[in-house]
């Protein structure tokens, strides 16, 4: 049973465990995989297999992440779990593992701790849209009032960071009991309750192809007699021949029309998310379009220069800076396909940022970039990556 292939017909959702060190994230991950694989097929994973998370690289940053998958009655889930706090910070900021929702694991015996708060804040900053709470180690708390108090604290903390604390599902259980095969309320029943909350509380994410058309410009060619061809990989949506599109970023936004879509030298009537295409533009000159701009559905995305961001600064060991940086530091910000210079304003209470830190900053770019909250970028100095970031809030 355990080795059966997953049914890919079910909708796919990405989730992950977050929360304070030793509150039981990895144990819960193992418990979910074990209980659900017995019910719906798939592979059970042992604690040690998940805890020995392999190294991977995202934007030049080394991150340890364990990926497991499981099924519920309605869905297929990909689930990430990180061994260390630093791995969570890097993972969430680089978007190496984009989450449609997070499972916040909080020990009922300890209540919310510093990393509980920090992970909720990070989830807010990087745009994790939904959080479900698993109140773990409930077998260690006999006092019902104490449980209620911890639940209230967690709800208040979620509300403080703009999550709907009062409406958030909170499941009480014990990952350890569930993993040991306990069939009771705190064991298997709690895991099934969690699976149910995942299915009902996190909406099915929009597929890339259903979004508004967007394609980062990688290259521009002039073809005599045909006009200007822009190449790139369609990030989301669909582009059909004859549709109006906007060229956004760097310069003033311009309108144009798609008169052809080519893929592998063949003419198509449309291109869609994931396709590497050449798009022929009517009446657009070669010099009107450049790398770093995007082609987009009219009105769907706007250019901005001023925003707040959550960034992770590479440590010296990761090939980052050897020294801290200060207010008004001016690196390049690499968005999609190009670098734009910008200046960094640090929070009032931060005099400097050390390599290996994560920090909230405000950025002013010298040229506008087509931007949305949640957009990832790299921070570079002369072509060398020194940090990674994500747009938290657009100012103008």
Curated annotation (Swiss-Prot):
Disulfide bond positions: none
GO cellular component: cytoplasm
Cellular localisation: Cytoplasm
Residues covered by region (G4): 136-139
Top-level enzyme category: hydrolase
Span of domain tr-type G: 10-206
Record's keyword terms, sorted: Cytoplasm, Elongation factor, GTP-binding, Hydrolase, Magnesium, Metal-binding, Nucleotide-binding, Protein biosynthesis
Single GO molecular function: guanosine tetraphosphate binding
Gene3D superfamilies: P-loop containing nucleotide triphosphate hydrolases, Translation factors
Sequence positions that bind GTP: 19-26, 81-85, 136-139
Residues annotated as binding Mg(2+): 26
Pfam families: GTP_EFTU (PF00009), GTP_EFTU_D2 (PF03144), GTP_EFTU_D3 (PF03143)
Region (G1): 19-26
Documented EC number(s): 3.6.5.3
Transmembrane segment boundaries: none
G3: annotated span: 81-84
InterPro entries: EF-Tu_GTP-bd, EF-Tu_GTPase, EFTu-like_2, EFTU_2, G_TR_CS, P-loop_NTPase, Small_GTP-bd, T_Tr_GTP-bd_dom
Region (G5) residue spans: 174-176
Assembly and binders: Monomer.
NCBIfam families associated with the record: EF-Tu, PRK00049.1, PRK12735.1, PRK12736.1, small_GTP
Known role: GTP hydrolase that promotes the GTP-dependent binding of aminoacyl-tRNA to the A-site of ribosomes during protein biosynthesis.
Family recorded in the similarity comment: Belongs to the TRAFAC class translation factor GTPase superfamily. Classic translation factor GTPase family. EF-Tu/EF-1A subfamily.
Name of the protein in question: Elongation factor Tu
Organism: Burkholderia mallei (strain ATCC 23344)
Upper lineage: Bacteria, Pseudomonadati, Pseudomonadota, Betaproteobacteria, Burkholderiales
Primary gene name: tuf1
